[in-house]
């Protein structure tokens, strides 16, 4: 089986616990305005590799991954577009080395398409963009209906989840939207961590190299106090979501 990849990183430290082998898959159905890897969107380019070829690149660094409590993270692009390939890769990583596996996904995927992949995934890094449907379309080119269905499916499973959200001033920092995102997270018992990632402009040069106009030109990076306020709003939503779930579970059937 072959997959189409963009690149690899052998010493990743921000995409899951420990030191990790990070595999960037090629292809994405979203076109996020702040994307720092727009060169991963096109599904027709990249490098075709077999599972065995990827395993051979992991093996020399196994000791680092094991000692640090790390493993392998597959990101993109959107890795669920190549779910069968990633599932086979994770399956072999577990069979050969019992390696921790993490999937970094936007959730833009039909649940049944990712079922086999999730069965061999220890951790899902779920990148939630926005709760508001129209705002989501403007930001990513796609509605969030499919993402919300996938998120609900994840909540029913045993996979550990880290939720990540990119905070963009004036775009993804609406108090109402952050609160509603928190409410959703609060209903998900398997969410272990929530990270608000401050928007940055480090990928702008890639848009320029591709001859694309950067959609967020002029948008500034958030201040620390703005990130703190956003975190507080999300946490308030999480508290409300947990309380609502608790009351719903404890309510007698009519």
Predicted segments, located by residue:
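Conserved alpha-helical substructure of the radical SAM core
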Residues: 38-68, 72
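Short, conserved loop/turn and helix-capping segments at secondary-structure boundaries
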Residues: 48, 141-144, 221-224
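Conserved AdoMet/S-adenosylmethionine-binding subsite of the radical SAM
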Residues: 59-63, 68-71, 76-202
